Amino acid sequence: MGMYQPEIETMDRNELEKLQLERLQKQVKNVYENVPMYRERMDKKGVKPEDIKELKDLAKLPFTTKQDLRDYYPFELFAADKKDIVRIHASSGTTGRQIVAGYTRNDLDMWADCMARQIAAAGGDENSVVQVSYGYGLFTGGLGAHGGSERIGAMTIPTSSGNTERQIRLMIELGATHLCCTPSYAMYLGETINEMGVKDQLSLKAGIFGAEPWTEDMRHQIEQSLGIKAYDVYGLTEITGPGVSLSLIHI
């Protein structure tokens, strides 16, 4: 397992909690001053930003629900001015009205750093070749993984999803070492690779899979069919896409 930002990733627990509190206080003040819904709900609970003095005070804050994100669509929960928003992503809306998330330039920088950490944890570095087979577009997967791969300095192949046999040819010819896609697509790639009889031509070492639930049985199938270590990356439109956390099998 490697690290992209060791000074952050190995931070002392006390220093980490101090940083978490500073950022929580800053964020609460920000939304209280800039988002009417949060200000109204905090006032209703009798909570002011200055009441957040320690991490456990998080429990004093009102919940935000998925329905809130739909009800205040598209921009009413944005704490940043629209002129500072440089990108929009959105959920698929399969279980209700879609939600949108606005990203500032700073958000995108932070997101790229977070995803770079996940790629490093899966053994990636500036010598790696990362094939991004998540879909690109409003879905966060493609551009999220792409940003992290470029941030770490890897050669990035933006194949997106589909056109599977071409993907496999590129994977072989360009020497992809890391694969980023959904676990179901990884399984399909593995099946197709074995049907084509080209598994021994792969240079893959690891896969970073997310955007849908998968089981340990699926993990084992993917690892066997592609000859890699398979890692589960977490993310959600409301925070960032992939890059929030990565599961590592280290015990």
Describe every region a protein language model picked out.
Residues 1-90, 95-113, 117-121:
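Nucleotide 5′-phosphate-binding alpha/beta core
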Residues 2-15, 19-32, 36, 152-249:
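Active-site glycine/GP-rich loop and adjacent strand/helix microenvironment
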Residues 40, 117, 147, 169, ...:
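Surface-exposed charge patches
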Residues 91, 249-251:
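Conserved small/polar residues in nucleotide/adenosyl-binding loops
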Residues 96-110, 146-156, 173-180:
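Acidic/glycine-enriched edge-of-secondary-structure segments
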Residues 108, 135-137, 184-185:
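Short glycine-enriched loops at secondary-structure junctions
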Residues 112-129, 163-176:
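Conserved ATP-dependent adenylate/AMP-binding module captured primarily in the ANL superfamily
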Residues 120-156:
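Conserved AMP-binding loop of ANL adenylate-forming enzymes
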